Amino acid sequence: QFENPYSTEKYNKVTDGTDRVYKRAKELGVKVAFGTDALFDPAAAAAQGRMLAKLKRWYTPYEILKMATSTNAELLMLCGPRNPYRLGPIGVIEEGAYADMLLIDGNPLENIDLVANPDENFVMIMKDGKVYKNTIQ
């Protein structure tokens, strides 16, 4: 995988550890949030959907979508005064909540791989009530 054998060995250890952690977390019913540290790297940020879709190895599409939405919101609310979303609930679609929504061309509950290609499959992207993409016809 890598030219440097040490890097390959390290990568394999991380991969093996990741497999064990996700399996054990699911067995124990641990709430898992989805996130990355790719905030300031556009190339890495673009890969987040692919990373999310890879979770199908351990979770159902429903569990993956819940993890990335309402469970993330629930766990974020635990950060107390550091919570940037104090004006309304997040992770839900209801009156007074932050209006963050994705509309996907297809059913990600049947095919979670749809989230791996947002440029093609996300037909509407809304963040805090502002529409950033709308290709609905």
What are these regions (language model features)?
Residues 3-5, 14-108:
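His/Asp/Glu-enriched, well-ordered alpha-helical/loop segment
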